[in-house]
Amino acid sequence: MSAVETQNLGMVPIVIEQSGRGERAYDIYSRLLRERVIFLVGPVNDQSANLVVAQLLFLESENPDKDISFYINSPGGSVSAGMSIYDTMQFIKPQVSTLCMGLAASMGAFLLAAGAKGKRFSLPNSKIMIHQPLGGAQGQATDIEIHAREILKTREQLNRILAERTGQSLEKIQNDTERDYFMSSEEAQTYGLIDQVISKRP
């Protein structure tokens, strides 16, 4: 059965390892977690953020001095969920190396830039996109006004962090995130979102 067929059936590949004590089976993600590799694939939401945060904390407890590799292929999603990942990345002792494979958009791009300086990478054909946070509110006018003010505060917070992570001016970040701003891997490197475009392992 091909990998695509396996994925369509909702199955996760299993890796069998042999040792002097016999055989042991791992799902592929658990096996990669042993190598300190974690993934964010798909939308950023409470569930995916909870899994990433738990893995970050687990790997810190395993070895607080060894880097963690964080692979990202995400269209973005919830700001609050994404910020829980961002804050945990800054909180833990190990440095987190980020790598974009495919797409890092919105909160995905924010987390890509949140990796340790000098250790933020992208594969050559990936796309990166930044924009301002989206929001929608219903209800009474006063409630809508409260939500609008909160979105503006969130935008200022995200822009300030992006300016710090990229080295761009706050004014440029504000202008560029006014609408969807797409970049190639090379453009993202020039912008300061990543440090290097890599096509092969060193």
Curated annotation (Swiss-Prot):
Q: What is its EC number?
A: 3.4.21.92
Enzyme class comes to hydrolase
In its UniProt record, a GO molecular function of this protein is:
ATP-dependent peptidase activity
Instruction: Return the InterPro entries for the record.
Output: ClpP, ClpP/crotonase-like_dom_sf, ClpP/TepA, ClpP_His_AS, ClpP_Ser_AS
Active-site residues (renumbered): S106, H131
The compartments listed are:
Cytoplasm
Is Protease one of the keywords UniProt gives this record?
yes
Q: Which UniProt keywords apply?
A: Cytoplasm, Hydrolase, Protease, Serine protease
Q: Which GO terms describe its cellular component?
A: cytoplasm; endopeptidase Clp complex
Q: Which GO terms describe its biological process?
A: protein quality control for misfolded or incompletely synthesized proteins
Annotated catalysed reactions:
Hydrolysis of proteins to small peptides in the presence of ATP and magnesium. alpha-casein is the usual test substrate. In the absence of ATP, only oligopeptides shorter than five residues are hydrolyzed (such as succinyl-Leu-Tyr-|-NHMec, and Leu-Tyr-Leu-|-Tyr-Trp, in which cleavage of the -Tyr-|-Leu- and -Tyr-|-Trp bonds also occurs)
**Could you name the domain of life of the organism this protein comes from?**
Bacteria
Instruction: Cite the record's note on assembly.
Output: Fourteen ClpP subunits assemble into 2 heptameric rings which stack back to back to give a disk-like structure with a central cavity, resembling the structure of eukaryotic proteasomes.
Which NCBIfam families does UniProt cross-reference here? clpP, PRK00277.1, PRK12553.1
According to its UniProt entry, the function of this protein is described as: Cleaves peptides in various proteins in a process that requires ATP hydrolysis. Has a chymotrypsin-like activity. Plays a major role in the degradation of misfolded proteins.
Entry similarity comment: Belongs to the peptidase S14 family.
What protein name is recorded for this chain? Answer: ATP-dependent Clp protease proteolytic subunit
Q: Which lineage? A: Bacteria, Pseudomonadati, Pseudomonadota, Betaproteobacteria, Burkholderiales
